[in-house]
């Protein structure tokens, strides 16, 4: 992609409305534009990152055995009345009526609808276990939306829903999602810590939030520092095996949100030197809620003895759009964003340091074409901006690798390769730069 043809409305000044780093950098880098309180348009740069995050989430859900579908954003109010949540959910739910006076709502979550889909088709335990997920926009009418995409009213979310015959089988599904979430966030360059948490309006008696530590986080957390060093399961993890040892390894080390924090246990179990009381950002939450929805909505299956029983359910959410903010909070410096390679909008940017110089232009074009031919996702800054402005823009938008080509280095047949994550620089031939990025 040539920058001269890319829509990248970079802001020179820090937006006054931005309270935290991620909001400020997303606005400055031309990733989003606020259209209303808590509602954002996703501009090309931000949308590229959003789609990469979404794809990682999708791949790990598929790997765990979950099946993707897509449910609508609008839901019938009657479904929520069946579950008893229509009046209980509160003013965060956007309630609307169509021209025929039918009551609808803009879904803040999908437990009711997925249960309705399940009960329409699944009648026997032989069709279990089943885990269905979708990635869809949701709306919650936050009283005070703030912090950009971290606490918006409209947001993109992955929510999965498991259906099992009994509690033991439902715990197996819960464990699969627990491991899938560990892998999902690790692939994005994040250390997300699972912590016991309140179940809130979703309900149930078991829940874990996945928290990324950050001073700007809204959640107070208490952890044993040992949890920071626990290994994340690799790509070869067998989801059909017993995952209990992995779950025990992660849950046996103290980690809790402030809502369920046990101060006495924390002091008793955790040596003082390993205690950490800080703040964090919730990027995902998983729930086991048993028969909370299946009983009132009569989602039943015939068991092995032929008797109908309510299914045991779980739900599993990831804040896909919120993850952009969380990643930036964890990966930035004073100059801008430092994207982990897996989610970066581009892997590399070619910086033409003297636009109009025939030799430099030709070298940039050649390198740009070679990288594209090798499958490298590359941005070519072919604008007529001065070199300093190009450096600043490249640092701001956070592309992992910068390839700088100017007349001085080119006279020696060299280009400069900069790694954004640590600022390290190397001088090498264009061919070596291509090999480094392809390898």
UniProtKB/Swiss-Prot annotation:
Cellular localisation: Cytoplasm
Protein's organism: Bradyrhizobium diazoefficiens (strain JCM 10833 / BCRC 13528 / IAM 13628 / NBRC 14792 / USDA 110)
A single GO cellular-component term on record: cytosol
SUPFAM superfamilies xref list: Class II aaRS ABD-related (SSF52954), Class II aaRS and biotin synthetases (SSF55681)
Annotated CDD domains: ProRS_anticodon_short (cd00861), ProRS_core_prok (cd00779)
Protein name, UniProt field: Proline--tRNA ligase
Domain of life: Bacteria
PANTHER family per record: MITOCHONDRIAL RIBOSOME PROTEIN L39/PROLYL-TRNA LIGASE FAMILY MEMBER (PTHR42753), PROLINE--TRNA LIGASE (PTHR42753:SF2)
Family classification: Belongs to the class-II aminoacyl-tRNA synthetase family. ProS type 2 subfamily.
Record keyword Membrane present: no
Protein task: Catalyzes the attachment of proline to tRNA(Pro) in a two-step reaction: proline is first activated by ATP to form Pro-AMP and then transferred to the acceptor end of tRNA(Pro).
Pfam family, one: tRNA-synt_2b
Biological classification of the source: Bacteria, Pseudomonadati, Pseudomonadota, Alphaproteobacteria, Hyphomicrobiales
GO annotation terms (biological process): prolyl-tRNA aminoacylation
Record key words, sorted: Aminoacyl-tRNA synthetase, ATP-binding, Cytoplasm, Ligase, Nucleotide-binding, Protein biosynthesis
